[in-house]
Amino acid sequence: MNCKNRFRINIWLFLIITFAGCTDNDIPQKENDIAPKEEPTPPKEDAEESLFDILNLDYSGLEEVKALYKAGDNDAAMQKLLVYYQNRTEILNPNLSATLNETEQGYADYAINEYRFYVNDNYLEDKTRKIPYSLQNNDKTINWEFAPKGADNEYQKQLHRHNWMPLQGKAYQNSHDEKYVLSWKEVYTDWITKNPKPNGKPDKFKWYQLQVSTRIMGQTESFEYFKSSPNFTSEWLSFFLIHFAEHADYLSLYKYAGENNILLSQAVALVFAGTLFPELKNAPQWQKTGCDIINEQTTKLFLKDGMTNDLSLHYHIGIVDGLYDLKRLIQLNKLPDNLLSPELDNVLLKATKVVMHFTYPSYFTKGSKNCSPAFNDSWIKTRSVLNKNFVKYAEMYPDDSELNYMKTYGKGTPPDSKIKTFEYSGFYVLRNGWTPQSTMLVHSNNISSKLEDSSHNQLDNGTFELYHNGRNFFPDSGVCSYMKENDTEVMELRRWFRQTKAHNTMVLGQSEEHEAIGSENINKAQGKLVLSEENDNQQLIVTENQGYGNFKHRRAIFYVKKPVEFFAFVDEGFGTATGYSKLYFHLCDETSTNNVNLDIQEAGAHTTFEDNNNLIIRSFGNQDITLKPFDGRISYQTDRKYSVRKAYSLIMEKKKNAPVRYITILYPVTTASNHKINATFTDNTSNSDNVSIEVTIDNETYSLNYQL
């Protein structure tokens, strides 16, 4: 080409022959699986933009590239640039790893089989065999508008994050099979051609900030995995760099409006782009923009108690992980320490301790799958997932004995077992130890002004989960679906799991019956801690929330450790409201339906597990209580599927200016038979700041009280 100052490549894409199949070492295939076809030929790689317009030819190491370009030998300059990148060793990406498990290897191969692109584990055509949906049209082209029947918006959003591409890069590193490179080139070229950058603000799906951020992070990995391939040509390098810069420029131009995980992912991606591709002209600006966002948002994204403002442990862990990656990026590439605020270290340490205190003692049992609560838009974390994070936390803070205890599955001195209050996010933890046989209760009383359907926090009004001796007796209902505004069925599912009565808490209704989805929801989530006390034998927290304009829920939780272990809940509803108060309880999960018995006459329930790990629940009130069974639900995937479990509500009439008051006893036992439980109020009902109760369990009486 004879243009000295500009090098142009014209985009010209033709159809590629597709191929399919897995190797003998991949996920087993049934006999009716589609047989492999011929491998594709690589696309013609042309583009209409100038590579040399986006390069900083004065960057150290590009001297020969610059000389060849100045001499008008653009082909040679491009070839020299490719050699430079292939031999570059001083720029280090902390996320690189050739480790690939069997499932990930399968996803790398399925991307070649009828364009079966891995989106996430919730969107699989065959969940048992881990087979993603196919995006192949009848004419063998890719349908980027595809979404499975009934899927919410997340499928299309996450499809455009290209999560399968780095997996193909890892597969290439392990096999050096060129089919992975050819697939990557073909599919990415097709995506770029069919999904051009918007002329203005980000759209909702393809060029939404989180999608762009994730693509940038993935491409920084794919580039390194594939760059040694003979099919990684100088023309492809040009195509890749032009569109990588296009992504980073666009992301730096449109800062996400919310102060949450999406904005943080945007910032991290920009710092990665600017650091890992410093040869590009705008790299310093990308890096600075990303660091500025992080420094500005650190105290906004993280609340003073260490929890992130989404109030979701799932997103919290992801945010901490992104900042861990960022710190490693800065350390490995010897960037100046002052790029990030000195506050970040202290904020991150607090954030790691949130994860630690939210971890159930089952974490210390090999193979455990249920090791965390799942409040709000969150999912239960397994032992292995949590440990990977604790290893990173201990790396960031090597002198912290608590994080090292978690990293090593219990070697050393455990954290203390005192009450942990996270007052700014509304979470509270009571426990008696850190062994698998321990007891731990997590109380959630959300503090958030975001109550709309799209919010990650739910309308809980003071719910809880209770872990005892390896079993979660009150797991949260979970999340069944994300958003899809124009799909009534999807939105009904999302609203069912978000509604207040889907939690272990109190609602205000207008009838004695279970009312329509969302009709009894609180309209304000400003949970407040009003008291916290403890001694060697007992822990107490008292919280409240003015969830309705004329009805306030106050919940006291007494945890009696000695001489007999039990919990006493005092739930009170104050205000001028009239109607019916309903105290909901949702027990165990779908696998335990036959082990949960509702005791209607005793206003409670009990479990009948054969492992001698059971619970009796009994409630008492300041007036008559009616127990109504309720079809509870539980779901920890956003695949619009759920299981039914046992639940119930305890109903009292709410009269004007008269409080409703419940006492609920949770008593861990080996078997539920032959136990007698009673509880009564012994205080002056005219003084709402004074609570005194007597609890009698098997002829032993315990006096519990607090004064505000």
Where on the chain are the PLM-derived regions?
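Cytochrome P450 core scaffold surrounding the K-helix E-X-X-R motif
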Residues: 474-477, 483-486
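Extreme N-terminal leader/anchor segments
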Residues: 40-127
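C-terminal motif of bacterial Sec signal peptides marking the signal peptidase cleavage site
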Residues: 19-21
